[in-house]
Amino acid sequence: MADTIQEAVTLALDDAPERNFRETVDIAINLRDLDLNDPSNRIDESVVLPAGTGQETQIVVFAEGETAVRAQEVADQVLDSDDLEDLGDDDDRAKDLADETDFFVAEANLMQDIGRYLGTVLGPRGKMPTPLQPDDDIVDTVNRMKNTVQLRSRDRRTFHTRVGAEDMGPDAISDNIDVIIRRLEASLEKGPLNIDGIYVKTTMGPAKEVPV
C-alpha cells in the first residue's frame, strides 16, 4: 500500500499549480455503508503523524502549580482556574479561543470546571481537553500533540484532515497517510470495506485518488 500512496502523493504535488505561499496537503475521506446518525459509528480519533503535521499546532493547557510552569515551555497558552472562570463569563472570548486552538490539555482535577464553564463552547466543536493524568509528563504530552491531527467525521460521510505540507516531500507525507489509513481501518466496523475512497491534494491543487 505504501507504494500506491506515494504515487498518489507524488502526482498531487507534481500537478499542483505553483503558488507564492506554502500549501498544506490534506486528504478527503469518503465513507460508505455506515449509519452516521448513530454517534457510535462516527470517527473521532487523534492520530500522531510520524513526520509531523508540517504546520504550527496551537495548544492551550489548563493547569496550575508546577505543571503550569513546565507547560509554559511548550504550550501556546497556559490558563489557570481563574482564567477558566473569566472565560465562562465571556462567551465571545471563549469562542475565539476555541476556534483558534487545535488541542486543549487539562489537569484532570480541572475537567469538571471546564465542563461547567466551557462545555457548551468546546463540546460541539469536538475540542474538550485531553485530561492529563498524574503520571503524565506535560512537556511530552504537548510535544506529542504538536504532531497530532484529529480524524472527525461527525455525521458526514466525507471529511478532511491535514497530512502535511508540500515541502515535506512525498516520502514523509506518504508515511503520514499510511498511519492515518491504518488507524481509520481499525476504527471502522468493516475496516476498508467502509471506505468509499480517499483523495489527496494540496490547498489549491487537483485531488488524486489514494488506492486502498
UniProtKB/Swiss-Prot annotation:
| Pfam families, A to Z | Ribosomal_L1 (PF00687)
Keywords (A to Z) from UniProt? Repressor, Ribonucleoprotein, Ribosomal protein, RNA-binding, rRNA-binding, Translation regulation, tRNA-binding
For this protein, the record's InterPro entries field holds: Ribosomal_uL1 (IPR002143), Ribosomal_uL1-like (IPR023674), Ribosomal_uL1/biogenesis (IPR028364), Ribosomal_uL1_3-a/b-sand (IPR016095), Ribosomal_uL1_arc (IPR023669), Ribosomal_uL1_CS (IPR023673)
- Any Gene Ontology CC annotation: large ribosomal subunit
Listed under GO biological process in this entry are: regulation of translation; translation
Q: Which Gene3D superfamilies match?
A: 3.30.190.20, 3.40.50.790
What does this gene product do? Binds directly to 23S rRNA. Probably involved in E site tRNA release. Protein L1 is also a translational repressor protein, it controls the translation of its operon by binding to its mRNA.
What's the subunit arrangement here? Part of the 50S ribosomal subunit.
Protein family per UniProt: Belongs to the universal ribosomal protein uL1 family.
Name the chain's protein: Large ribosomal subunit protein uL1
The gene from which this protein is expressed is rpl1
